[in-house]
């Protein structure tokens, strides 16, 4: 671990402390989109085995997750839930998550490198978009692992609440088994109603339940912060 003294020394130096940023869960029909940002000391060797999280086994991701958390100067993981995804759309929800993640490490990071070809607005530091960054940049690889492991763990927890859908297996993606469960049971509160396969199976009961959840979300501290961030884009 880097001590507080060592970290402060790095902050006061000209060392390029770059936050790697990536997301997990843009495509699934259920659950949150998760974004992670992580900052390493560039003078230290890279963690062995880092790769795009999609290319790693679950066991390997879990092992690397522990190493990343131990070695990071700072990291932040943000979850944007299905209600916010439906309110914004998945692209804007992902941009919001990226901005919140970068803000969470801005006390350490001097810049950010974000996987993809677009950057969120109003970031707290200079940033660049890197297409294919999760396969090219070790810090983005680490962020992809933090995001993926966090999301997978969350989907296993959701399986305990909604065992009919098999979230622990497919993690919310539109597999044949998931689509069959949707057809049989209809959507739950964790499904993204703005996604066509879910929208086609909506019932009045499901719509009412989401509206109630949305109303509750409107009064939450997270929603207040969310509104403030959106206003800053205007």
From Swiss-Prot:
Record's subcellular location: Cytoplasm
EC numbers on record: 3.1.26.4
InterPro entries: RNase_HII, RNase_HII/HIII, RNase_HII/HIII_dom, RNaseH-like_sf, RNaseH_sf
Catalytic reaction equation(s): Endonucleolytic cleavage to 5'-phosphomonoester
Entry annotated with the keyword Manganese: yes
Necessary cofactors: Mn(2+); Mg(2+)
One GO location term (cellular component): cytoplasm
Function: Endonuclease that specifically degrades the RNA of RNA-DNA hybrids.
Family: Belongs to the RNase HII family.
Name of the protein described by the UniProt record: Ribonuclease HII
Gene for this chain: rnhB
